[in-house]
Curated annotation (Swiss-Prot):
Organism per entry: Pisum sativum
Family: Belongs to the BetVI family.
GO cellular component: cytoplasm; nucleus
BP GO terms, sorted: abscisic acid-activated signaling pathway; defense response
Key words, A-Z: Pathogenesis-related protein, Plant defense
InterPro entries named in the record: Bet_v_I/MLP, Bet_v_I_allergen, Plant_def-hormone_signal, START-like_dom_sf
Inducers of expression: Upon contact with the plant pathogens fungus Fusarium solani.
Origin: domain of life: Eukaryota
One function term, GO molecular function aspect: protein phosphatase inhibitor activity
Transmembrane regions: none
Signal peptide bounds: none
Key word Cell membrane present: no
Annotated protein name in UniProt: Disease resistance response protein DRRG49-C
One Pfam family matching this protein: Bet_v_1
Length: 158
């Protein structure tokens, strides 16, 4: 198995507590409301905390697909969230799992700094393709921007 690590950083004008609430606490409800392609996020096992398995159902290229997320950490006090994509048809054939470690911190002018570490655990000697990485980054950025946009458009959300 190979492990390939990628780091990302973004800034937001939204305060970290509010952004964490949208990205983590309320994500199962908000994400399908603000992103048309995401149809549902439902718990299939667990209570929402570490060990919980969630099924994210989405439409891509006219087909309904899903991925399974395993929650590994939810730290509301420190605005941190770790999870892995562990299954589903949205997971590339050459990848065993993709792990995400996300952390928000206070940024300039009351906003946030978002840091994300992504690890691809590949099967055998497989290497994630540039296309897989590019598509994964684009999807992640799209979700981040959509939920950030929701917070900006709804200033009473907190």
């Amino acid at each position: 198995m190979g492990v390939f690590n990628f780091e990302e950083e973004a800034t937001s004008i939204v305060a970290p507590a509010t952004l964490h609430k949208a990205l983590v606490t309320d994500a199962d409800i908000l994400t399908p409301k603000v992103i048309d392609a995401i149809k549902s996020i439902e718990i299939v096992e667990g209570n929402g905390g570490p060990g919980t398995i969630k099924k994210l159902t989405f439409v891509e290229d006219g087909e309904t697909k899903y991925v399974l997320h395993k929650v590994e950490l939810v730290d509301d006090a420190n605005w941190a969230n770790n999870y892995s994509i562990v299954g589903g048809v949205g997971l590339p054939d050459t990848v065993e799992k993709i792990s995400f470690e996300a952390k928000l911190s206070a940024g300039p002018n009351g906003g946030s700094i978002a840091k994300l570490s992504v690890k691809y655990y590949t099967k055998g000697d497989a290497i994630p393709s540039e296309e897989e990485i590019k598509n994964g980054k684009a999807k992640g950025e799209g979700i981040f921007k959509a939920l950030e946009g929701y917070c900006v458009a709804n200033p009473d959300y907190n």
